[in-house]
Amino acid sequence: MDQHHGARGGAPIRRPRRSIESRSHPFRATGNTQRTYSTPRLSYRDGLSGRTASRDPQEQASNQDESSNPSTSNAQQSTSFWGYLRRVFSDDVPAQPQAPRPRADFAPPAGEESSSEEEEEEGPAQAPLDEEDQLMYADQYSVGDSSDENDEEEDPRLGSDYPTSAESSEYHDHGEMVAGAGAESESETDIDAEEEEEDDEDDEDDMEVIRDESYRLPRTWLDKSIRLMDEALAQSSELSKAITKSTRSLYDSQFAPGGRGYTQTATPSRRLVQLSRAGMYDSDKIVMTGDYMEVDDDPDSAYQLWVRAIRHPLAMNPSWEETISNHTNPSFSTDIDYDIDELIEKNLARTPPVFEGLLDSAEFFYKLPMLYTYATITQDEAYEERLAWSNTQALHGHEQSSWQALLVYYSRGGMYVSPTQEPRGIWRRALKQAMALQLKMCVLGLSDVVTKQNATHHHTAVTFLVDALLRTARNCYLASRLLVFAWERRRETGAKRPAEPLIALSGVTLLQPLPPEVSELLEQRTFDIGLRTPNSAVFRAFFGSLVYWAELRLALRDPASINCRYVGFHLQTSEIYLLARAHSASPGYTKEELVAMEAILTLATLMLEVALQWVHVACAQLLSENDTIKAFRRVSASIPHALAPLGSIRLHDAEFEVLSNPDVMVARDETALSQALFLGYFSVRTALTACMRDYSHEADGGSKETVTGVFLGVGLILQRLAGHLNFLLNCLAGAALYGGQKINIHSLTLPRYSLLADVMAPMLQRQSLVDFWRARDNMLEDLEITPRPGPPTQGKRVVVEMPLPSDDLPDMTPGASVNNGAGLGRMVDMAKQLQHYRETIIGEEATSSVGKRGLIRAGVGVAALRGRRRK
């Protein structure tokens, strides 16, 4: 018996049961000490990376030799009762038990910080990542690899000192250069000795690294920093981190918007040129009939039918009404102190570049009296305005900052964005990290330029804003005519057929042409892409960041100032929640959140179109010789803005159609992200309607300064709204293309968004899907935050929960529709429709693999799941 059973002593033995973690996650990386079988089981990530399931022959031989050697100290370590007694009474010293090595995707990153508040509250143990989610992210994201393990693996794509296009690989590899594992490690003394020899060759080598003629700037410091970074990775992580940060700052200073190395296209893209040429010819003219040119003494008389159709006035946000009632300066200040001679001396009282040669300075400032916006804003006034922003009550209860001087505290280390068990809850750790990330993505780029360049004052932003707004109005002129001729030629074939998005929008568009007699200054045949200067590049970037500039908000004066602050704060809250619920390691959202995101994207895009048509008409009225004709009653009448959002029946009906959907109503009240998104939407809707109402009241014999200030305030809000839509669309598209989630979207939302983004090109530089997620990962790395899948670990599970749905939401849905159909289109699959917008939305440099995850279920290697879509 002893001959057959050895250490068991004849006693029966029970096979040890695998742990829960082993049974839930059988695919383990090579080298895991918990595996008891000899053949390594590789995950699908390993299969995609080219690893094989067979070990090295020498390694197999050594393992066999070790297993064949007899044990002299009970090395077999039987787990039976008799074996336990043998070990107790044996003279051999038992080996120290080794704790199993945790999986990298379940362990927090090294050096992860926790606030004292997070450590006070303990929660249940960390739940393992669902196996289906692991397979879904296998070929796109590094779910389980820690930063230390990545540094030890050689990347075959890094063949030079500079990274190639990020689109040549999978998305999440965003061009970060790491040292190869195959390089021989050297001691510090050897490296110091070599540095003396390399110093003599730096001057020659640094200038020979880049041979491309397009790189004209000497970047010796950048090249040297990259080489030092590669060497530091083999020495210590702390030195590597410091050099990486310095390299990143050097690159940012060179290639950030407005930097010396930042390139801007001087002419419209080929796509825009083709879009305008194919849709309208030189001989095309619009002849409008009717009484448009007659004087309109009572603009409200044309809207009496609205009073009978809509029996209840438009509901405004209760929080907005409270903000206005508590505002200390609710009206326009007429005693603004500024010296016209000083403005002329500073070369500020000049015609915007868009109208140079068309209007002289005196004529332009007579039509748009905006010189008061150049008045000096004191530091105390700016500080009080920033403080008013921070003192606004947020949904999450934490203070939000609008500028660099008021940064938030956050915990470094892992960022966990999984849903919480509580309804309307969110992890506080992720929320604080998202606040810091939102500041870095949307605010710090502008604030760094403003604070570091003393020559950048708010009047430069005012000049950019008025110029960009006028250029946008001219693009509205062109787009409205392109849509008219697209409708006329919708049945043509071949070269005469307009672009399909124009045909789809032509029957439902709200961009309507104005009579040629009142829009001569707006006439153009190609799309305007705006100024191309260093300052304009900064003002156009960062998702519409000008609203965060306190001096600029104050320069516009009330009522524009208070409305801009109100909109900026609540859209910032929405984006914080968006960032706190997804990242590259977990790009998906819950079903309810996706429903709310699609609803807001659809309604906000339509609202942007309504507002751009208002800008189109208001700009023509401000520049016209006679501003009381019937062609301008769209902006002169007050009844529309009292009954419908932004004075639009179409938007009124669209809100009823979308918000009355039971799925949308449930999503609105059940998740924190949905509430933040809806409050952000209704904040913009309320502020824009209020500004348009103030404009109509002052346009008839009121203050022209107030009219001009409101006009500029609407432009500032629209820039932030368009940037928010860009932000929201990239998050939603990332869930569809990178997360593999099935998302239904209204068919006309993406065509409408694409056209409006072209129209607003002078005001906003939109960011593509690929660039958005790459920049997001880069900024997380700068903040020392690591995206992690699953829920946070024990001690970091504090939840910020909204106990009840917001009081602002229930009364915002219209009670009934006025007309049949809102022109939103039918529901289609978002991943499929995005394939038609690879240049405008996904990104011109995107590879063909981007988006396949949304078209094919990401169950790589599992035949039962292949081809299925996530429900």
Swiss-Prot record:
This is Tegument protein UL47 homolog. Its main location: virion. Interacts with US3 kinase. Interacts with UL31 and UL34; these interactions seem important for efficient virion nuclear egress. Interacts with UL41/VHS. Expressed in late in the infection. Residues 1-212 are annotated as: Disordered. Belongs to the alphaherpesvirinae HHV-1 UL47 family. It comes from the Viruses. It is found in: Virion tegument; Host nucleus; Host cytoplasm. Keywords: Host cytoplasm, Host nucleus, Late protein, Transcription, Transcription regulation, Virion, Virion tegument. InterPro entries: Herpes_UL47. Phosphorylated by US3. This phosphorylation is required for proper nuclear localization. Residues 30-41, 59-81 have a biased composition (Polar residues). One of its GO terms (biological process) is regulation of DNA-templated transcription. Pfam families: Herpes_UL47. It comes from Equine herpesvirus 1 (strain V592). One of its GO terms (cellular component) is viral tegument. A motif (Nuclear localization signal) lies at residues 13-33. Tegument protein that can bind to various RNA transcripts. Plays a role in the attenuation of selective viral and cellular mRNA degradation by modulating the activity of host shutoff RNase UL41/VHS. Also plays a role in the primary envelopment of virions in the perinuclear space, probably by interacting with two nuclear egress proteins UL31 and UL34. Residues 114-134, 146-155, 185-207 have a biased composition (Acidic residues). The nuclear export signal is CRM1-dependent.
